[in-house]
Amino acid sequence: MASQVLVYPPYVYQTQSSAFCSVKKLKVEPSGCVFQERACPQIHVNGRHFGNPLPSTKGSAFQTKIPFSKPRGHSFSLQAGAIVVKDTAGATKVIAAQAQQAGVEAPRAVVWRNRLHFLGGPQRCGLKRKSEELDNHSGAMQIVDELSILPAMLQTNMGNPVTVVTATTGSKQNCTSGEGDYQLVQHEVLCSVKNTYEVLDFLGRGTFGQVVKCWKRGTNEIVAIKILKNHPSYARQGQIEVSILARLSTENADEYNFVRAYECFQHRNHTCLVFEMLEQNLYDFLKQNKFSPLPLKVIRPVLQQVATALKKLKSLGLIHADLKPENIMLVDPVRQPYRVKVIDFGSASHVSKTVCSTYLQSRYYRAPEIILGLPFCEAIDMWSLGCVIAELFLGWPLYPGALEYDQIRYISQTQGLPGEQLLNVGTKSTRFFCRETDMSHSGWRLKTLEEHEAETGMKSKEARKYIFNSLDDIVHVNTVMDLEGSDLLAEKADRREFVSLLKKMLLIDADLRITPIETLNHPFVSMKHLLDFPHSSHVKSCFHIMDICKSPSSCETNNHSKMSLLRPVASNGTAALAANFTKVGTLRSQALTTSAHSVVHHGIPLQAGTAQFGCGDAFHQTLIICPPAIQGIPAAHGKPTSYSIRVDNTVPLVTQAPAVQPLQIRPGVLSQTWSGRTQQMLIPAWQQVTPMAPAAATLTSEGMAGSQRLGDWGKMIPHSNHYNSVMPPPLLTNQITLSAPQPISVGIAHVVWPQPATTKKNKLCQNRSNSLQNTNVPHSAFISPKIISGKEVEEVSCVETQDNHTSEGEARTCHEASVRQDSSVSDKQRQTIIIADSPSPAVSVITISSDTDDEETSPRPSLRECKGSLDCEACQSTLNIDRMCSLSSPDSTLSTSSSGQSSPSPCKRPNSMSDDEQESGCETVDGSPTSDSSGHDSPFAESSFVEDTPQNPELGTCAGTEAKPALSTAVEPPVGTERGLNVDAHMANTDSTCQPLTKGQPAPGKLNQPSASAARQQKPTSAFQQQHLNLSQVQHFGTGHQEWNGNFGHRRQQAYIPTSVTSNPFTLSHGSPNHTAVHAHLAGSAHLGGQPTLLPYPPSTALSSAAPVAHLLASPCTSRPMLQHPTYNISHPSGIVHQVPVGINPRLLPSPTIHQTQYKPIFPPHSYIAASPAYTGFPLSPTKLSQYPYM
């Protein structure tokens, strides 16, 4: 039974002294079970509801905040789940991963006794989770002085941690108890050969020893140290654990989802194991949710990750032997929901060294072969995993036996008696079964309760919450009542597959039990059965959640010495670099950083065919042409200075495009070098998806039907398997003429996904309001800057948070200013934006330079204001969030943002949760305070974007009030140097279109777009009207100002067109199906496969000296000197000049504008590409570009 801990004023304490320490006893009064009555069946996960929720605005499940309204010294009660410390084997309750500063250390030392049991030990409403009786009433009880009840990362609102009791150290503070436990003192220093660790908090205790939270001195790193007992009975197992951890340390812990062990050392004859700090175990998570059932879409990623860990252990011949919810840790439930790792290898052993009748596993999760004394292997871990996922589904253990007899009795009643061949061999079978002798044939039967009690003297108890006659009955438990239509059908199919897998995992015969590899291929994990419901929002949510557990593995593999190709290097001319493959649902864009003296090329998208709507091309890759220094490859001396690589796509797509002739490139392109010591490489940015059936000409965002998997989009090609042959010289039809020592500079595209993911390693700015659907990979090459602090400086400063900085809301912010600023620009207005719900403890103050000279004082409607319409795109789930793309200018940086999510003022709407959830009224965003969507929170300064152009107040309305457009794109040439050519586009969207406001000239026309709702119905209607675009206008599409939020970097410069250039109408090329015109790129949602669209610039007149020529991406946070560059051109043999094609992702949005005189281009404005300064239009599928069967 649980207890309440009551803290009394100091005069109530009775101090007792001994030879070892002075202790103030704490009065403990028992009370009823805290969780005796189940609350309404709802699960809070990061402000989201699962199951059958009721309207609530309370805190989320991951917040264990306990409001303390009374001052210190007054009586208060604590929930049991807050400070339970389990005294079980492997009960490593690691609760926080927040760096502790030296200034906040408590001044007083505290001694933890070896019998520190809070709240009557590990009990679940009267049910002990272990068979061992715990001595909970003997010994002095002590709680850490200044010990915060909450995890350090979740204490943002806790002003005063609770001082419970104090203790002063005695003369023998570091002695070892009779049971072998080490006597810890707070702020004691544990020393290894290389590092010193300061003890901060006590985390947990078990039969192995204890776990403490420590600070690694000299760094910001917080670790968990497991201090083993020095008792002789634990010495052998301690050595086994150390050897197993040493073996696992050679593997990628992030890829295989087990805890990372750093080092092992001896401290006062106690073995100390140093691990990474993790957040919370699954048992505590269930307890915080009052043991409410979890939905299958949450159980699935946990199962997948643990099965991946077991697969690796099986391949190494290792048995974990203690898998249970306490040993499955949530890495970071706030920023990486559903990301779990397996911990505690204290009971692990090699399969060749197993001994029958060994007491292994926690009882609730103990396999029948262990109970019966049969030989066992890795299959016992699969049984335990089956019990774990059943517990997550039921909210209660499937077989909660208080005794082993109860355990096998529960199993036999639900699944039938073990086979006779098993009972005959089992060394402990006669403890629970007896042979029948009065029958014609001998058989086994389970002993009755009376027989077992008479033999053992122990009375059996009924502890089950659900009593099943068959495992098939589980499908009817906790049915979801708020689903209908295809969502309900998908849920029923999911339940059937779940029960099918559970039955295979819980087979009594271990030889027939499913293996980890088979589990990963089961339809419940692969979700093949859900492909029958392509339009279900519930299914989409399942795929997005599964992406959480798939993304980190592929990315972290690259960042943990698995691919030296992507490891950062540092040189004199190039800063340390990193490569990031960012998962964006249907596209993985590679982000690279480099110094100012290098040009970064995101990629040259090469399209395989001309099919664009609803069909995937057979072979389609994006290559990155760049010197090895940019890729992080050190120069290999003594080897050839250049080579080519052929990249094969392993997963071809079905295509309807007619075969076209391959493009040619001059052989000298790949053989030239940028310098004498570097090499050129072609590196794929992403690989394609599994085969899908083409859906011809459907402009819909839900064209993910067929057999494709959302989670398979953007998978990275392993370098070791695909760089296996040499690529022939012919690559492009556009002949590229290069000066030998200079890098190629081509048009590139920014792909911006609205949800950046964050980890403890890189501290990306997190979009907390939608962290459930984080699908990004947690390792970033460079951090997407938030709103830039537009200071009038003529230098470049880069302020980055350290990778291992532990502040939760810290984000790297890059402050960039122009090398030379015009005086008129330097006088522009600045306004301060305070992000109200910033996850950072301090208020984020961001200053932005406006783009106007006139100081407007009258308020004008906020461009970011959300009207709360049902069609508001910013208020929808990320399943419908548009991806944003713009052609990079020299001052552009890759920015990640989420409309209505990472914005300072998220729209408070009942349906702002995932698509499959009903309106529940829960608007808690990870504990962040609510804020309104007001004008002062707008990421843009409240001043006009266009100089000398009257502003229309009606343009500030939210685009969501109208029909949502299918896509939004903007093509932007690089920065020009002539201020006379400036055109600042003011984005407005009152009728689903955006008209550019050209200085001194009205926008001639609009571009009609269909509503997104119509697109979702898959009506095969034409999205755009074909029209001629003249040179004196620039068309932009957008969903309104609500799409712009605080995560954008510098507002990029819009495409500007000199009005002096004569108009030259342009019609689209006829080379693709359904070429019903589009202005800049294709209709995003119709472009289902995410294949890059080829956007060559049309033939035009000669290039002027100040014309924009190529889209050059400059690395953020670096200086931008004027570089002298020899000229080059990208030309077609026939004389028609084209820009190198640019890859665009579906559902794209334009980037914010920036005044073009604020920043200077990287290169001088002389003509170095044969392109026109005026961009008239872009063909969807140029006839000059072809398919590449070798890609």
UniProtKB/Swiss-Prot annotation:
Chief location bin: nucleus
Function: Seems to negatively regulate apoptosis by promoting FADD phosphorylation. Enhances androgen receptor-mediated transcription. May act as a transcriptional corepressor for NK homeodomain transcription factors.
Gene symbol of the encoding locus: Hipk3
Region (Interaction with FAS): 774-867
Region of interest: Disordered: 801-828, 888-960, 993-1022
Catalysed reactions, semicolon-separated: L-seryl-[protein] + ATP = O-phospho-L-seryl-[protein] + ADP + H(+); L-threonyl-[protein] + ATP = O-phospho-L-threonyl-[protein] + ADP + H(+)
Domain Protein kinase residue range list: 197-525
InterPro entries, per database record: Kinase-like_dom_sf, Prot_kinase_dom, Protein_kinase_ATP_BS, Ser/Thr_kinase_AS, Ser_Thr_dual-spec_kinase
Low complexity bias (residue ranges): 888-905
Annotated effect of mutating S357A: Reduces enzymatic activity but no effect on autophosphorylation
UniProt region (Interaction with UBL1), positions on chain: 846-856
GO annotation, cellular component aspect: cytoplasm; nucleus; PML body
Span list, region Interaction with AR: 766-920
Catalytic residues, chain numbering: D322 (proton acceptor)
GO MF terms held by the record: ATP binding; protein kinase activity; protein serine kinase activity; protein serine/threonine kinase activity; protein tyrosine kinase activity
Entry's EC annotation: 2.7.11.1
Mod. after translation: Autophosphorylated. Autophosphorylation is not required for catalytic activity.
SUBUNIT field: Interacts with Nkx1-2. Interacts with FAS and DAXX. Probably part of a complex consisting of HIPK3, FAS and FADD. Interacts with UBL1/SUMO-1. Interacts with and stabilizes ligand-bound androgen receptor (AR).
Binding residue positions for ATP: L203, G204, R205, G206, T207, F208, G209, Q210, V211, K226
Protein name per its UniProtKB record: Homeodomain-interacting protein kinase 3
Residue ranges, compositional bias (Basic and acidic residues): 802-828
Record keywords, A-Z: Apoptosis, ATP-binding, Isopeptide bond, Kinase, Nucleotide-binding, Nucleus, Phosphoprotein, Serine/threonine-protein kinase, Transcription, Transcription regulation, Transferase, Ubl conjugation
